[in-house]
């Protein structure tokens, strides 16, 4: 009896046993007029982000398919993709987090390799999480999570002040990172120094910022006392980073992405969304509805709520970020170059040169 029951379970749930390749769903037939471009990313969590990026670049001649590297040992990570640079081409491109490679320019071997790779695209911001946490987009995250559009907190102003506050420690952390052999200010210390443990909504989080300023000042003073010989070299280092676009106001876009998301932005969002939900519930309970009608109204509202983290991970309202604009231009140049080469090689036969140019222009207008 138990054996028959297990057999029935297998029929209803194919995941009770490993499926063979022959049993897996087959991909839909591709458009023969479009060239398939394989886009490899660092990990599974990056697939959705880069899918959202390349959705802005649809055109009649190329189709992008996003995935982790397709190898039997299922490798993942930036190092794996960097090992694939020699294989990259018009039909195989690589997308990675910049980490510090953009800011460091040619100061390290890895930054030179990333910045000079013809078919590798990087975020310019430290990681994809920094785009998701782009300050002007955070109010919309609250609206989608709570279904309440009331503005009770200025995310842009707070993140401006936060970024300026942590800027001195960011310089120490970045300087320590580019030394590679010296553990002056490692990530674990940077993370503990720039995290916010709470948000006091009064005066747009000013008390929280004051608390952070005190912590940052203490840590900076300690670093200067411990490493007096690094103070002058750091001034030159700062000028070089500013030449790459770093400012006190946008430092949060270049800091460690998971630290920003988990220890700063999620603290803000949880606090703000809690208040917005409470406001909506208070409005419902203060209404004239009673009994079953009130209960149904409350259920309708609570059922419409979404996980704050899930909404943040789905956030795509970062397209006005200047760093995204740089990534956008890189991809546009690659697409224009590839389509032009396809036309010259005869891969695009039916469309005239003017038609190709018009289609490319229309594709850019979609963005």
Name each model feature, range by range.
Residues 2-367:
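Acidic, divalent-metal-binding catalytic cores of TOPRIM
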């Amino acid at each position: 009896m138990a054996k028959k029951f297990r057999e029935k379970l297998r029929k209803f749930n194919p995941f009770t046993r490993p499926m063979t390749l022959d049993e897996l769903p087959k991909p839909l037939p591709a458009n023969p007029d479009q060239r398939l471009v394989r886009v490899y990313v660092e990990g599974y969590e990056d697939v959705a982000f880069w899918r959202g990026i390349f959705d802005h670049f649809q055109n009649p001649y190329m189709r992008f398919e996003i995935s982790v590297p397709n190898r039997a040992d299922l490798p993942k990570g930036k190092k794996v993709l960097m090992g694939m640079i020699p294989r990259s081409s018009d039909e195989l491109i690589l997308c990675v987090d910049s980490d510090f490679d953009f800011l460091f320019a040619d100061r390290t071997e890895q930054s030179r390799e990333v910045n000079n790779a013809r078919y590798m695209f990087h975020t310019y911001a430290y990681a994809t999480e920094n785009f998701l946490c782009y300050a002007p987009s955070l109010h919309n995250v609250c609206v989608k999570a709570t279904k309440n559009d009331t503005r009770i907190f200025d995310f842009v102003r707070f993140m401006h002040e936060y970024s300026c506050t942590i800027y001195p420690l960011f310089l120490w952390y970045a300087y320590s990172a580019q030394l590679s052999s010296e553990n002056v200010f490692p990530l674990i210390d940077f993370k503990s120094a720039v995290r916010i443990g709470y948000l006091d909504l009064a005066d747009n989080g000013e008390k929280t910022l004051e608390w952070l300023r005190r912590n940052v000042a203490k840590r900076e003073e300690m670093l200067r006392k411990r490493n007096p010989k690094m103070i002058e070299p750091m001034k030159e280092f700062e000028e070089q980073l500013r030449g790459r676009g770093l400012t006190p106001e946008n430092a949060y876009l270049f800091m460690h992405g998971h630290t920003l998301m988990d220890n700063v932005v999620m603290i803000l969002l949880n606090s703000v969304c809690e208040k917005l939900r409470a406001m909506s519930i208070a409005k419902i309970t203060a209404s004239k509805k009673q009994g079953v009608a009130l209960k149904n109204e409350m259920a309708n509202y609570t059922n419409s709520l979404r996980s704050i983290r899930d909404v943040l991970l789905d956030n795509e309202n970062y397209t006005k970020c200047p760093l995204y604009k740089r990534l956008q231009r890189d991809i546009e140049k690659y697409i224009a170059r590839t389509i032009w080469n396809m036309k010259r090689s005869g891969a695009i036969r039916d469309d005239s040169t003017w038609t190709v140019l018009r289609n490319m222009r229309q594709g850019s207008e979609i963005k």
